[in-house]
Amino acid sequence: MAEEKDKKQSSRRRNNRRTEKESEWQERVVQIRRVTKVVKGGKKLSFRAIVIVGNERGQVGVGVGKASDVIGAVRKGVADGKKHLVNVPLTRDQSIPHPSTGEGGAAQVLIRPAAPGTGVIAGGAVRTVLELAGVKNVLAKRLGSKSPLNNARAALEALSSLRTFQEVAQSRDIPVEQLY
């Protein structure tokens, strides 16, 4: 009887660990679009889902999934987003270390650090990317295309080009205190 109890507890622990790892990531669907492919027999319908995945602690990714049903497309988008994760260096006040720009297709995104208490001032897919990356104080401006996918990719590129103060100091061969 005691062995059965131990087995149940250990399986519960295993299940808890699994759900903890899964719940660490947040997923937000930015867009679901019905797309068609013209084939010999007519038109074939499918769905495209743009999904942003992040842990709100400096990791974020954008994924695209296509399937004949919405749930399958979202599932594929989540898997794709987890494959294309980017690490974002965050400052103590949950902002970014310096201004940055990124391009994705015809979309261009400018992001700038903001003072504590400012919040995320951005729109559309860019806002979702920044929130799921864990950035709490930032200003962003979207230029060019209004496509959610290109804007999300541009925001991801801008975040991936960020460097920490330590990296900059190391590349210049100076102490970190000299940067401030």
Swiss-Prot record:
GO molecular function annotations of the record: rRNA binding; structural constituent of ribosome
Gene Ontology CC terms: small ribosomal subunit
Record domain S5 DRBM: where: 25-88
Region feature (Disordered): 1-26
Compositionally biased residues, Basic and acidic residues: 17-26
Its job: With S4 and S12 plays an important role in translational accuracy. Located at the back of the 30S subunit body where it stabilizes the conformation of the head with respect to the body.
Cited PANTHER family: MITOCHONDRIAL RIBOSOMAL PROTEIN S5 (PTHR48277:SF1)
Domain comment, as recorded: The N-terminal domain interacts with the head of the 30S subunit; the C-terminal domain interacts with the body and contacts protein S4. The interaction surface between S4 and S5 is involved in control of translational fidelity.
Protein name per the record: Small ribosomal subunit protein uS5
Organism: Synechococcus elongatus (strain ATCC 33912 / PCC 7942 / FACHB-805) (Anacystis nidulans R2)
Gene for this chain: rpsE
